[in-house]
Structures are given as structure tokens and as C-alpha cells.
Curated annotation (Swiss-Prot):
SMART domains given in the database record: TPR (SM00028)
Species of the source: Arabidopsis thaliana
MF terms (GO), sorted A to Z: calmodulin binding
PANTHER family for the chain: PROTEIN NPG1, PROTEIN NPGR1
UniProt repeat feature TPR, residue ranges: 32-65, 66-101, 135-168, 188-221, 307-340, 551-584, 585-618, 620-654, 655-688
Chain intervals for the UniProt region annotation (Disordered): 12-40
InterPro entries: NPG1-like (IPR043376), TPR-like_helical_dom_sf (IPR011990), TPR_rpt (IPR019734)
Signal sequence, start to end: none
Full protein name: Protein NPGR1
Subunit structure: Interacts with calmodulin in a calcium-dependent manner.
Length: 694
């Protein structure tokens, strides 16, 4: 044993220029001494001194064969002679020594028993110093193989260290036992090295197994070192698969990353921004956006600016389908407290985008877009084009919800101006959304030719079947009364459309057939539509959408039967629709029309008012109430006129309301006014689509 060396060893230790015994020098897994890197070894010892030390070790009678090889192999490794080191290490038969190593480790962990001075430790018991020396030799052998590119063999050698120590310490590394520091250091380096070797060898399964093995027992890893291992395992689980990552792997990675983030929050480990990035990716992959928002809220102040925090949280809530919460967070950036802060560009752009999707928040969207445009020339043309696009959409939505005619006209002009500005700024690389939104806004404002040009341009630029584009084109063609062309486009589109898209197209086709006075064809189309809806597999995400489609299909079929005068069949269809969606304003309006056809005026009024109780601004129901009032006598004409004026305030282009307003004026003896109302109804009907443009 080296610890029982004779004077030969002391003579080696006393040599000039060698302040430490070679047998007791600490060695890191990178092949460097505890004091200096491998590159400093030659500066510490002259070549002649290394040769002399090597010769001395070979002649030292106190070292056994394996220990001498361990020391000689270490010297060769430190000098960069990996082939030579490997040859030396191969002479150590670790399989023969394993039982003695395990026994030595086990005996070291046993509680000390009182013994007489006459008791002598058996000479066959290996000291912990020798155990560490031999295990270090295996580690260096693995390192040598790694340097020579033999990664699989290196991993198998490294695994020996783990097998030996785990057999001796099945419950993990004990605390407070003297003489274990060197052993623990070597073992922990082997724990960290093994998965890296398997990774280099291309064995994904063994890499994961090695990381899990390192985390399965308490090996006294310091918190930061343990965190690095946990992070490495999480990254391999997330990104290591060649194909799609298995669900179990993602879940395990999420648990590991959550633990690490919690440790960061309480200060157990250093802050690592990459952990939040990886957790964001993992939770996004599994759709757990609200959980991600919760972890973002736990991050310490200063990690993100307030703008960044609101932006990230709003992304989470929006992805989770909680747009209202997302918009409320984004609106904080518009408050007076943020006026002195540097504007967060992505936040403003995302705020404008979210608000453009919801007409209720169109005013907030206008504010977001204006804040972005106020930054002026400091932004790219693309960004300014996006800001103008969302501004135009928000102006259009605001116009449709405006109660004042003057304001509505002003907002409509602003909408077209902003969308045209977006198109002009992106002229070099036209954006499809800009062209589409501009076409829709032109259609809503009954600029039918401009809308048609935009719809055709959009469809041609898509370069394939775009259900959204072709559907819009069909509706625009219906506004030009080119109903056959519109139906042909739908037939063409349905050949390539998916099932959900085909449902929307079939519904529009049925409406087109009704407009062409083809009720039997429309009935057949509605039947096909219902069959397609029922054939769909329902999931949590699609169930509500399919239920909405089926409700509308039954209501459409009721309208078809109503056109044919088959009111009992129409009522049956409406009962089916009500069983799926009781609180449907259109359903109650159609029910009222059926009752009105049977001259049940009071019951019809009840149905119409039920519709308005669900949606107070439901224009068809308001017009229906006015029509019933008109039949109740001349004394009800002012009330009917009031309802019709309210309908036109909500929808100024409703030709049906203008027509009935003409009837009211005619009954009141206002012939000139009636003629003007009829003229307005006629002109609006010429450009009226069979289905809303929005």
C-alpha cells in the first residue's frame, strides 16, 4: 500500500520540484491536477524529473502491481500519451479486484467497534486510498478511450465505477465518513461522464438511463451540480429523440424543469434563464399555457421587465383561449405609469392583433396600433405595415359597432385608408392578410368591384385551394348576383377541402340554392350537411363547434321548409335545433316566423322578444317585430317605425328594414318618403350578399 511506503517513497516526495506525492495528488475528470491544468504539468516538472519519478515508482517495493500501473497510467495520461496510458491501464484486472474494493468500502461505512490493541487489521483489507487510486485508474482509462474516439468502450469502463460503488453503497453516499472525499469526487465525476459518453456513442436510451441512474439515489451532489444533471436529463428527454418526443418523456422533462425553476425562485441554485425557455417550450408543446403563466408569475422581479412579463403572460393566456385576460394585461402597458418606459414593440403589436379579432376591444386595438405608429421611422416597413393592417381592421370593427352615423362613416374611411396604407407599404412583398382584409372591408362597405378584385387577387396568390379565400369570393359573387358562378366555385373548393371546411361550404351552398329558388336542391344539400356533421369524431375541442354547425344546419333546413310552406316540418327542425342550443336568437326568430305564418301574432311576438332577450341587437328579430306591429293597425305604425329605425341604426345596409320602412311610410301617407325608402332598399338589395361578409 502507498500509505505504508518505505523510505523509497519518502525519498520520492523529497525530490526537488515535486511538492506533492504522485500517489496522493488529486485528479479531476478532465485529466488535470487539483492545483494546475494538464498544460502546467510540464512547467512544474522538467522532463528529467518526470522520468526520475516514473523510474522511482517502478522500483517502489511498497506498491503492488495494480497500484503501480494506476500511477504510471496517470502519468502517461497527464502527459497526453493516451495510447500509452491505455496500455498501462489494461494491465489492471479490475474484475479480480472488485470484491476487495467493495469489501473495503463496506467496512469503511460500518460503525467502529471497540477492539484491543492486540487486534491487527488483516493485511488483505484494502485502504480507501488504494480504492480511490484504482477507481481513478478506471476513470482515466475511460477518459483515454474517449480521447481516442472509442466512446462505447469508454462508457462501459465508466459504468464499472458506478456498478462497484452502487454494490457497496446501495443506499447512496453516506455523510460524515472520513476518507470518502476522494472516492466521492471520483464517483461523481463518473456519474457526470457516463451519460456524455453514451451521448457521443449515439445511444439515446443509455444516455437517458445514465442520467436517471445519477438521480435515483442520494450521491451527495452539491445543489448546483445536481441541477446541471437534472437540466441535462430534461434537455435529452425534450430534444434527444430523432422523431416525435414520447409523451412520457415530455412529462418527465416538465417535472424536472418545474423543480429547477422552484429551486431558482427560492435561491437554492443560480438563476438560469435557459430553464424558463425550455419550460416554456415543454409546456407549450403539451398545451399547458395556464401552468406556464403561473410559473412566469413566480419569476423574481428584475428577471423580466414589466413589459416583457406582461407580454409573455398575455401570450400564455391567449394561447389558452383566455383573450380577455391577455388583453387586460396588455392594456397595462398603455397606462400612465408606463409613459416613461421604453415601448415594448412586440407587446404593442400583439395587443393590436388580439384586439383586431374581437370587435368589443376595437378601440383598444386602435390605441395599440397608434402607439406603434407613433414610434415612426425607427421601425421597419414590415412592422409599420402590420400596424396599419391591424389599425384598419380595428377601425372597421369599431365602425360596425358604432351607434352614430357620422362616426360610422368616419371610421369606415379610416379603415380603408389604413388597409390601403398597409398594402402600399408591403407592395414589394404583398401580404395575403392585408389583401384579404382590404377585400372584406370593401365588401362590407359595398364597394363590390374593389372587393371582387381583391378576392380574385387573394385566391390567385394563395396558389392552391384556400377555403377562406374561395368562400369569400363566392359571397362577393353572390353580391353581384352571379349565383351560379358562386356555386361552381364552392363545388370546386369542396373537392380539396377538409371535413370541417366542407361543412361551412355546404351551408353556404344551401343558402345559394335557396337564393336561386331551388328549395329541393337546398334541402338535399342540408341533408348532406347534417350527415357530414354526424360523421365527425367529436373531441373536447371540436364538440362545441360541431354542435354549432348542426344547430345552424337545422335552422337552415327550417328556412327551406318555410319557403315551401311546410310549417310543421319547419317547426320539427327548429325543435331539433333548440334541443342543441336553446338560447339561439336566430332559432327563436325562425320560430316566430312559423307562428306568424299561422297568424298567431301574439305567440310570434313572444318568440321575437325572446330572441331579443338573448341578443338585444339581433336585427332580423327587430325587423320581424316591426312587421307584426304593422299588421296590428295604424296606431302601431309609430312603434313599428321606431323598431325599424333602430334596426337601421345597427345595420344601415339592411334592405329588408328599408323596404318595411317604406311600407310604414306608405301607410302613413308619406308617399315621397316611402319612394326614397323603396329606392334605398332596391339599391342595397342589388349588392346584398346571400350571407354576411364577416
Amino acid at each position: 500500500m502507498l500509505c505504508a511506503c518505505s523510505g523509497e517513497q519518502f525519498r520520492f516526495e523529497d525530490q526537488p520540484g515535486s511538492p506533492e506525492s504522485l500517489a496522493t495528488r488529486d485528479f479531476s475528470a478532465s485529466g488535470l491536477s487539483s492545483r494546475n491544468g494538464g498544460g502546467d504539468w510540464d512547467s512544474k516538472l522538467e522532463d528529467i524529473q518526470v522520468d526520475e519519478a516514473e523510474s522511482t515508482l517502478k522500483e517502489a517495493l511498497s506498491l503492488n502491481y495494480e497500484e503501480a500501473r494506476a500511477l504510471l497510467g496517470r502519468l502517461e495520461y497527464q502527459r497526453g500519451n493516451f495510447d500509452a496510458a491505455l496500455q498501462v491501464f489494461k494491465g489492471i484486472d479490475i474484475k479480480v479486484l472488485t470484491p476487495r474494493i467493495i469489501k473495503a468500502i463496506v467496512e469503511k461505512t460500518l460503525p467502529c467497534k471497540p477492539r484491543s490493541k492486540a487486534v491487527i487489521v488483516p493485511p488483505t483489507t484494502m485502504s480507501m486510498h488504494s480504492v480511490s487510486l484504482l477507481l481513478e485508474a478506471i476513470l482515466l482509462k475511460a477518459r483515454s478511450l474517449e480521447e481516442l474516439g472509442s466512446y462505447k468502450e469508454a462508457a462501459e469502463e465508466c459504468k464499472i465505477i458506478l456498478d462497484v460503488v452502487e454494490n457497496a453503497l446501495p443506499s447512496g453516499m453516506p455523510d460524515g465518513i472520513s476518507g470518502f472525499a476522494k472516492l466521492q469526487d471520483i464517483f461523481q465525476k463518473a456519474l457526470e461522464l457516463l451519460p456524455l459518453l453514451w451521448k457521443k456513442a449515439g445511444n439515446h436510451h443509455e444516455t437517458i438511463a445514465s442520467y436517471r441512474r445519477a438521480l435515483s439515489r442520494p450521491w451527495n451532489l452539491d445543489p448546483q451540480r445536481l441541477a446541471v444533471t437534472q437540466k441535462s436529463l430534461a434537455l435529452v428527454l425534450l430534444y434527444g429523440s430523432v422523431e416525435a418526443c414520447p409523451k412520457d418523456n415530455i412529462e418527465e422533462a416538465i417535472v424536472l424543469l418545474m423543480l429547477l425553476v422552484k429551486k431558482m425562485v427560492v435561491g437554492d441554485i443560480q438563476w438560469d434563464p435557459e430553464l424558463m425557455d425550455h419550460l416554456t417550450y415543454a409546456l407549450s408543446m403539451t398545451g399547458q399555457f395556464e401552468v406556464l403563466a403561473n410559473y412566469l408569475e413566480q419569476t423574481l422581479p428584475g428577471v423580466y421587465t414589466r413589459g416583457e412579463r406582461w407580454y409573455l403572460l398575455s401570450l400564455c393566456y391567449s394561447a389558452a383561449g383566455i383573450d380577455k385576460a391577455a388583453i387586460n394585461l396588455l392594456k397595462m402597458a398603455l397606462g400612465p405609469s408606463e409613459s416613461r418606459q421604453i415601448p415594448h414593440i412586440p407587446l404593442l403589436l400583439f395587443g393590436a392583433k388580439l384586439c383586431s379579432k374581437d370587435p368589443k376591444h376595437s378601440r383598444d386595438g386602435i390605441n395599440f396600433a397608434h402607439r406603434l405608429l407613433d414610434l415612426g421611422n425607427s421601425q421597419s416597413e414590415h412592422l409599420l405595415s402590420q400596424a396599419h393592417k391591424f389599425l384598419g381592421v380595428c377601425y372597421g370593427n369599431a365602425a360596425r359597432s358604432s351607434k352614430l352615423d357620422s362616426e360610422r362613416v368616419f371610421l369606415q374611411k379610416k379603415s380603408l385608408f389604413s388597409l390601403n396604407e398597409a398594402a402600399k407599404r408591403g407592395k414589394a412583398d404583398p401580404e395575403l392578410d392585408v389583401i384579404f382584409n382590404l377585400s372584406v372591408e370593401n365588401a362590407v362597405q359595398r364597394n363590390v368591384q374593389a372587393a371582387l378584385d381583391g378576392a380574385v387577387e387573394y385566391s390567385s396568390m394563395v396558389g392552391g385551394v384556400s377555403t377562406k379565400g374561395w368562400k369569400h369570393l363566392a359571397i362577393v359573387l353572390s353580391a353581384e348576383k352571379r349565383l351560379k358562378d358562386a356555386e361552381s366555385i364552392l363545388d370546386f373548393t369542396m373537392e380539396e377541402a377538409g371535413d370541417i371546411e366542407k361543412i361551412e361550404l355546404l351551408r353556404l351552398k344551401a343558402v345559394l340554392q335557396m337564393a336561386q329558388e331551388q328549395p329541393k336542391k337546398a334541402m338535399k344539400t342540408c341533408s348532406s350537411l347534417l350527415g357530414l356533421i354526424r360523421a365527425q369524431e367529436k373531441s373536447e375541442q371540436s364538440e362545441s363547434l360541431l354542435q354549432k354547425f348542426e344547430t345552424e344546419a337545422w335552422q337552415d333546413l327550417a328556412s327551406v321548409y318555410g319557403k315551401l310552406g311546410s310549417w310543421s316540418d319547419a317547426e320539427t327542425c327548429l325543435e331539433k335545433a333548440r334541443s342543441m342550443c336553446y338560447y339561439s336568437p336566430r332559432g327563436w326568430n325562425e320560430t316566430g316566423l312559423c307562428l306568424e305564418a299561422k297568424s298567431l301574432h301574439e305567440e310570434a311576438l313572444i318568440s321575437f322578444f325572446l330572441s331579443l332577450s338573448i341578443e338585444p341587437d339581433h336585427v332580423p328579430s327587430i325587423v320581424s317585430i316591426a312587421e307584426v306591429m304593422m299588421k296590428s293597425g295604424d296606431e302601431s305604425l309609430p312603434t313599428a317605425k321606431s323598431f325599424l329605425m333602430n334596426a337601421l341604426r345597427l345595420d344601415p345596409r339592411n334592405h329588408d328594414a328599408w323596404m318595411k320602412l317604406g311600407h310604414v311610410a306608405k301607410k302613413q301617407g308619406l308617399s315621397q318618403q316611402a319612394a326614397e325608402f323603396y329606392q334605398a332598399a332596391y339599391e342595397l338589395e342589388l349588392s346584398a350578399p346571400v350571407q354576411s361578409f364577416i
